[in-house]
Each structure stands twice: as structure tokens, then as C-alpha cells.
């Protein structure tokens, strides 16, 4: 029997706040009978949204009142100093104290990472936490990190990202010995900067990691690796570029099918295929970036997410909490450190 999982939700964060988080929470409770959710935010506002949604499962849904909200453009340092009663911080504090098994927020990414790192701390042996998300590929999906938390990384940092990504892919997505690839400007050993080359050496030496070598940008979408490792600058640019290209292709297809009567008829005939394609590349399906390397489960939802997308982030947080991903990462790092000391 599955034990109860409690998640704290930053109900005020993101572009839409409670209007997205509350319905997403109610839908998540229907999907997960063992789940208890805590909506963290301004109680009066949250109760209004619950009443509007005809909420009827109060036994597994509760509210934690707080008075402040972190703005989407607020500097992380200001959020840490001046927003100690914010919905984001209180939700993470619940993870720190053990009141919640994980937390989900659609709020300011920089403030979330800074607050999570300050409250939850990094795991022993992990220098920096990283942001990991899932990206659709020809073979299904791949997991990519870092996506913006660390602009400058050493080879050791990239190696740690590979370890964390492999553990999460195994535990949450059921992949056995996931292939870990380093994003690079070429597949040849001589290509890349010193940090990437050093990371490659460390990954090759580790028996804990199934290292797949260097992969180029197009290799991400061909499914050449289950986990793709890069620094946060490269990862964020690659992710945002991919989202832009997907939007461009969708718009081009829409324009072409509306060009004339013949193309409109073709569009009607192709509608089932187009709908299937849209589902496969719909970014909402892959919403929910994991903050790996912390002593607790924390998920970042896209700020503009709708209730369906936010619900996907909740689903990922449930799986990470069920599997105890932070503990699994800690155990893997301990084995690696022990192997280094014994070498």
C-alpha cells in the first residue's frame, strides 16, 4: 500500500496564481488517492477559488496562510531578505521541517532556487543544485540539465549533474542504466572546452554511470542519450530555442492549412494526425523542472502554466517524493566518493 505523500504548493506564484494552482490541485487529488496537498498563500483568496471550484475533498486539502508574494521580476536577494512570509518560502519551509515531502512553485526561478538552496541546503558531495526538465524526442523523451541555475560550471560540476540526472531518470522515469551524454559542439574527443573534456574523463572513469559520449544539439531530439548534461547557460539557450522553433513550426502549419480552400480541405483530412502531433510536442506535457541536488524535493513549474501543465509538475513531484530522489542521489554520491577514496 502506498503511504501518504504531502506536497506544499506555492499557490500565489506564477503568472496566474490561484486561478491555475487551485484547479490543478483538485485534479491531482483525483489522480492520486494517497496525496495530501497544502495550498500556501493568502487564505481568503484561496477559499474564494476553492468555492468557485466546488471543492469537496477537504480531508486531503488544506491551506497554510501567509501574507507575502514573491514577484516574478523580484531580485532573489530581495526575496530572501524581505519576503520571509511569502508563499514560496513558507512552502519550502514545510519541506525543510518535514511537514511536506515536496514542494511545487510556478514563481520566480531565481528566487525559488536561492530560497530552496538557503532553506534545504545541498546534499553532501554536491557543489551546486541543477535544474532538470524533460524534452520530447523521437524515441520518447530525454532529461536535460542544467537549464539555467549555473551559468559557469567546472568539469566536476558537470559530472555531478550527470550523476543526479541518471539517478532521477532511473527512479522517476523507470529507465535502467540511462545513457548520459555531454552536450558538445561535436562528437570527436578533441572538440569542446576544458570543462567539458574534464567532465568526459570523470564520466568515463565512473562505473556508476552509463556514459554515451558527446552529443550535438540535434542528437538531443534523436534520442541519442537519456540524460543530456550541459552548463546552465547552454542548457537554457537550447531549451528556449527549441520552444521557439516548435512555436514557429506550429504557426507555419496553421498558416499553410488556411492559405486557400484546397489547403483547408487538406487540413480537415489531416486533423487527427495534427492533433496527435500537437499532443506529442505540447510543452505542457513536460512541465515541471526538478531542482536536483537539494536535501528535499522541489519542482519549478513554468510561470505561464495552465492548470493541466501545473498538474504535470505535481505528478512529477509525487513520483520524486515516493521514490525519495534526494536520498537516492545522496547514496549514489556517497558510493562515488568512497570509490575515489579507495582508488
UniProtKB/Swiss-Prot annotation:
The keyword Zinc-finger belongs to this UniProt entry's keyword annotation: no
Enzyme class, UniProt record, top EC level: transferase
InterPro entries according to UniProt: FA_synthesis, Phospholipid_synth_PlsX-like
Catalytic activity line of the entry: a fatty acyl-[ACP] + phosphate = an acyl phosphate + holo-[ACP]
Pfam family, one: FA_synthesis
Gene Ontology MF: a single term: phosphate:acyl-[acyl carrier protein] acyltransferase activity
Compartment list: Cytoplasm
Gene3D superfamilies, per database record: Isopropylmalate Dehydrogenase
EC number(s) given by UniProt: 2.3.1.274
Pathway it works in: Lipid metabolism; phospholipid metabolism
Record has Lipid biosynthesis as a keyword: yes
Keywords: Cytoplasm, Lipid biosynthesis, Lipid metabolism, Phospholipid biosynthesis, Phospholipid metabolism, Transferase
Subunit structure: Homodimer. Probably interacts with PlsY.
Biological role stated in the UniProt entry: Catalyzes the reversible formation of acyl-phosphate (acyl-PO(4)) from acyl-[acyl-carrier-protein] (acyl-ACP). This enzyme utilizes acyl-ACP as fatty acyl donor, but not acyl-CoA.
Record-stated family: Belongs to the PlsX family.
Protein name as catalogued: Phosphate acyltransferase
Gene, per the UniProt record: plsX
